[in-house]
């Protein structure tokens, strides 16, 4: 029997996780990948890559929003709030003046590009064409801000 941490159950039952689980050859391989994913950073800063208005690039799973200013805090509550927000937040963009944030997690019909961020999740994995008629893979070329999309090659 699979042990699924509580934090992954929404993913399992609402976001296609069951199909993902079934694609693994063994439970051990699945748990190995979970440990690998848990070891990854919540965001990556590219301070040498800048926009025309001198914002440096930050790539994150979800938008960093208003919690960006607490990313280096040593306060346990701040750390927990930041990590949770960067993994799970939706619709809470914020202009953190020194950065340009590229993120996913929230599915859009088209890339959501503004002067301080770009949401690039166009739901490539999504199978329900009634709810999302045009799921695609999306990439942002930085700092030109050119957007590339590719339809899913899977059925």
Indicate residue ranges for each PLM-predicted region.
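Acidic, His/Gly-enriched loop-helix segments that form or flank divalent-metal centers
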Residues: 2-135, 142-153
């Amino acid at each position: 029997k699979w042990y699924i941490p509580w934090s992954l159950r929404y993913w399992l039952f609402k976001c296609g996780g069951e199909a993902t689980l079934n694609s693994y050859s063994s439970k051990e391989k699945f748990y190995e990948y979970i440990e690998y994913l848990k070891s990854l950073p919540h965001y990556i800063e590219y301070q040498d890559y800048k926009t025309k208005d001198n914002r440096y690039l930050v790539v994150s799973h979800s938008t960093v929003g208003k919690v960006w200013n607490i990313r280096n805090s040593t306060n346990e509550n701040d750390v927990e709030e930041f990590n949770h927000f960067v993994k799970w937040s939706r619709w809470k963009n914020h202009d953190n003046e020194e950065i340009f944030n590229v993120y996913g997690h929230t599915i859009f019909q088209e890339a959501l590009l503004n002067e301080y961020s770009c949401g690039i999740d166009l739901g490539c994995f999504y199978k329900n064409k009634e709810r999302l008629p045009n799921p695609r893979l999306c990439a942002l070329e930085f700092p030109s801000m050119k957007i590339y999309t590719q339809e899913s090659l899977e059925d």
